[in-house]
């Protein structure tokens, strides 16, 4: 029985955030491509003129170190991401790991605060 596009889409839709991130990295390595968005030339010219005054609106939450209180950090990671226990534990132990991508500044700062209170070291990119 051949695998259809719908089968692939259904499989991907059931992946966790961490598993999906790993899948994207494997695609990038295997096919020599980048998942970075392509910028249109016209937008680049317009963006260059006002780019210095613009404030960054989307952030990635990167866990740099789980700290000494890993259990507390795992609990916060699970609450923030919706990951299962094993995925959250792996994310905390295999640092640096991207917990969330493209979130608002307020959400990123709140997540950073919660993670740091639990004992983690976090970077917003």
Curated annotation (Swiss-Prot):
Keyword Transmembrane found: no
GO biological process, one term: translation
Keywords, sorted A to Z: Ribonucleoprotein, Ribosomal protein
InterPro entries with a match to the protein in the record: Ribosomal_bL12, Ribosomal_bL12_C, Ribosomal_bL12_C/ClpS-like, Ribosomal_bL12_oligo, Ribosomal_bL12_oligo_N_sf
GO MF annotations in UniProt: mRNA binding; structural constituent of ribosome
Domain of life: Bacteria
Keyword Ribosomal protein: yes
Signal peptide extent: none
One GO CC term, this protein: cytosolic large ribosomal subunit
Record-linked Pfam families: Ribosomal_L12 (PF00542), Ribosomal_L12_N (PF16320)
CDD domains: Ribosomal_L7_L12
Family per record: Belongs to the bacterial ribosomal protein bL12 family.
Protein function: Forms part of the ribosomal stalk which helps the ribosome interact with GTP-bound translation factors. Is thus essential for accurate translation.
Quaternary structure, from the entry: Homodimer. Part of the ribosomal stalk of the 50S ribosomal subunit. Forms a multimeric L10(L12)X complex, where L10 forms an elongated spine to which 2 to 4 L12 dimers bind in a sequential fashion. Binds GTP-bound translation factors.
NCBIfam families from the UniProt entry: L12
Protein name (database record): Large ribosomal subunit protein bL12
Organism this protein belongs to: Campylobacter lari (strain RM2100 / D67 / ATCC BAA-1060)
Highest classification ranks of the organism: Bacteria, Pseudomonadati, Campylobacterota, Epsilonproteobacteria, Campylobacterales
Gene: rplL
């Amino acid at each position: 029985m051949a695998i259809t596009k719908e089968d692939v889409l259904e499989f991907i839709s059931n992946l966790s955030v961490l598993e999906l991130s790993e899948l994207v990295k494997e695609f990038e390595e295997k096919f020599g491509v980048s998942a970075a968005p392509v910028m249109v030339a016209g937008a680049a010219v317009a963006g260059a003129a006002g780019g210095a005054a613009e404030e960054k609106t989307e952030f990635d939450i990167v866990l740099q170190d789980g700290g000494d209180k890993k259990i507390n950090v795992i609990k916060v990671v699970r609450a923030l991401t919706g990951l299962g226990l094993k995925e959250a534990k792996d994310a905390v132990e295999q640092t640096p790991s991207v917990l969330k991508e493209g979130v608002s500044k307020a959400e990123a700062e709140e997540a950073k605060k919660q993670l740091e209170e639990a004992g983690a070291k976090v970077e917003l990119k």
